[in-house]
């Protein structure tokens, strides 16, 4: 009887295939993790860049408000203009003498938010109007930026009363936030609170000291200004608010 060779068939256990699948899945997870990390880093950088732009815009608004108070150009020369520039034709003007303070404050207090054309009486109640969206709880940012029936607004735009250039051009690049005036809620605004200073403090010794102490204040008129600047970023979630107190001291002849 002829011998029939016996053949042993070896069946693959599938370990190699399983190993390959595991490595493929790990590679996919690593690629997904890398893409998500890259996307997250891009979001962080983008948000930070937008915040920095808004911060620079708010600083520029503070400086513009100072020039508005002083009635000067950036080079120190006297501001000369027409219309709103230098407040030539604006009813609300920076007080130059003590007699100007009372009528100005009385006029401002008659308006919504006690502000008009960038000048305000001292705010009472809640101070952070930029965070308020409910008019029943106080003045809102929308009310402080929206144009009124007479065409005026409570706040002031960059360059509105100083003539500073805000439009972008090829030879004069500018912060895009300051140039954004598409709606009242975009771009940047500033408000100047006129705070009368107590005349008696000049002789009280509280601030004005002896020759070995601080230099005496030379305020004419006796007014301190509190400036609030709000800049909205290019992203709807970005907002920068800066405040500073400013005392305009007169140089003695």
What are these regions (language model features)?
Residues 2-253:
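Terminal alpha-helical segments
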């Amino acid at each position: 009887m002829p011998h029939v060779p016996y053949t042993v068939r070896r069946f693959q256990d599938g370990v190699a295939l399983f190993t390959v699948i595991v490595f493929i899945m790990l590679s996919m997870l690593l690629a997904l993790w890398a893409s998500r990390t890259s996307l997250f880093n891009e979001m962080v950088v983008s948000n930070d860049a937008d915040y920095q732009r808004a911060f620079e815009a708010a600083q520029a608004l503070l400086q513009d408000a100072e020039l508005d108070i002083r009635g000067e150009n950036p080079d120190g020369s006297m501001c000369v203009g027409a219309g709103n520039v230098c407040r030539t034709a604006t009813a609300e003007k920076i007080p130059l003498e003590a007699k100007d303070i009372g009528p100005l404050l009385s006029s401002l207090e008659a308006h919504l938010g006690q502000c008009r054309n960038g000048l305000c009486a001292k705010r009472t109640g809640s101070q952070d109007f930029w965070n308020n969206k409910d008019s029943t709880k106080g003045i809102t940012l929308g009310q402080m930026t929206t144009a009124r029936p007479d065409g005026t607004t409570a706040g002031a735009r960059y360059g509105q009363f100083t003539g500073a250039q805000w439009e972008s051009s090829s030879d004069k690049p500018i912060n895009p936030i300051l140039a954004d005036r598409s709606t009242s809620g975009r771009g940047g605004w500033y408000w100047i609170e006129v705070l009368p200073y107590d005349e008696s403090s000049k002789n009280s010794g509280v601030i004005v000291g002896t020759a070995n102490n601080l230099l005496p204040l030379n305020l004419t008129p006796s007014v301190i200004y509190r400036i609030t600047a709000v800049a909205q970023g290019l992203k709807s979630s970005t907002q920068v608010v800066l405040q500073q107190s400013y005392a305009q001291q007169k140089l003695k002849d």
